[in-house]
Amino acid sequence: MSSVCALLLSCALFLVAHGSLQERRLYEDLMRNYNNLERPVANHSEPVTVHLKVALQQIIDVDEKNQVVYVNAWLDYTWKDYNLVWDQAEYGNITDVRFPAGKIWKPDVLLYNSVDTNFDSTYQTNMIVYSSGLVHWVPPGIFKISCKIDIQWFPFDEQKCFFKFGSWTYDGYKLDLQPATGGFDISEYLPNGEWALPLTTVERNEKFYDCCPEPYPDVHFYLHMRRRTLYYGFNLIMPCILTTLMTLLGFTLPPDAGEKITLQITVLLSICFFLSIVSEMSPPTSEAVPLLGIFFTCCMIVVTASTVFTVYVLNLHYRTPETHDMGPWTRNLLLYWIPWILRMKRPGHNLTYASLPSLFASKPNRHSESLIRNIKDNEHSLSRANSFDADCRLNQYIMTQSVSNGLTSMGSIPSTMISSTNGALTDVSQQATLLILHRIYHELKIVTKRMIEGDKEEQASNNWKFAAMVVDRLCLYVFTIFIIASTIGIFWSAPYLVA
């Protein structure tokens, strides 16, 4: 039994040694008189046809700011080398052999739009040569390609980037570069979390230069990338919309709360922060403004305008009759027309269309108020005159009373004279009593007048406060409509919303 095993092992070792000898002989025969600088064609006037295919593995990153795309891909080259053909039967049925890159001829095809520091970033793998002379070379690499990023619809944008491959020294009459069947292979593609890849295309071009009549072919492998919007929707757009809607709360706060302007300024700073994030993500170009930037700018304009109107509302709220007089146009617009349009109700006032004054009418009852003011001024002058007469008569009464007392104390004065004097004093006393009552009436009238004037001042202040409420309510409606309309209008213009 042991002798049989030894015999089988010896046969196996002989076959292996014989096979390795066949492969060595094949390498020696193929490399004999071979020059890797020679184009593998039987006739030098014929071009070498090279087929190229790109097997995309992964989109690593898209740097919008620097306009660079990082891609992991395999390049698949095939061509025929007539110097590397052999008969399988003569070499132990060997079907293929491997050569290191540079050992045999290979096309000088490069990625034209590479921005890598080494320019050619492929790994130089072995080349597989088949007995028919077909050479198959698959060098993998991490490619950094320049791509013009169109940020007009960011983050609802689609980018079209491409690989441009072409020979660096051979023209089209010496090297014919053709896309292989299934030129862009994405069967092993690992999906990217930020970019979807709905379409890939291949295109061959021939370019003629002024210096040379020969064509220079190149092959473009296009990547049609569509940005996924979920991240931007939840991390930028929704917070910005909610922050902008907070400006509407500022129009519902009463001015006496003290936090009205603080809220608006805080929201404005928040929008500025979001806008700075978008500017950092976008490339520094002046060709277009990104859609998201337009949205944030619109939000910032809304918040800025709301801050300005909040200041105006506070200014109206704290106005007094001593500092401001409400004009007829302002009165009719803010106290009648706009409240009626907005269906605002004010206690003690019933607004109907029939009771609305003309928008450009003068101040109501202005002439009657002037007439009343003149009458009151005359009455005040008359009261001053009556007060002067009352003072004279009162003084006369006091002097007469003093004289009467003096005469009574003097016994030499006749009684008839004293009687007549007492009668006169009685009349003067009655008149003095009436004058004192008139003085009291006059003082009460002054107090009443001051109370009426105070009520008028309070009513004027309330008018200013109500006007501030009207402006607040008007801004609430206008800004709500504008925010909704602008948001729908901006995002409705995007080529897509969900990818």
UniProtKB/Swiss-Prot annotation:
GO cellular component terms attached to this protein's record: acetylcholine-gated channel complex; neuron projection; plasma membrane; postsynaptic membrane; synapse
Topological relation to the membrane, as annotated: Multi-pass membrane protein
GO molecular function, one term: acetylcholine-gated monoatomic cation-selective channel activity
Swiss-Prot/TrEMBL GO biological process terms: chemical synaptic transmission; monoatomic ion transmembrane transport; regulation of membrane potential
Disulfide bonds: C147-C161, C211-C212
Sugar-modified residues: N43, N93
Keywords carried by this UniProt record: Cell membrane, Disulfide bond, Glycoprotein, Ion channel, Ion transport, Ligand-gated ion channel, Membrane, Postsynaptic cell membrane, Receptor, Signal, Synapse, Transmembrane, Transmembrane helix, Transport
Localization per Swiss-Prot or TrEMBL: Postsynaptic cell membrane; Cell membrane
Segment forming the signal sequence: 1-19
Keyword Transferase attributed: no
Pfam families in the cross-refs: Neur_chan_LBD, Neur_chan_memb
Function: After binding acetylcholine, the AChR responds by an extensive change in conformation that affects all subunits and leads to opening of an ion-conducting channel across the plasma membrane. A subunit of the levamisole-insensitive nicotinic receptor.
Family: Belongs to the ligand-gated ion channel (TC 1.A.9) family. Acetylcholine receptor (TC 1.A.9.1) subfamily.
Protein known as: Acetylcholine receptor subunit alpha-type acr-16
Organism per entry: Caenorhabditis briggsae
Gene symbol of the encoding locus: acr-16
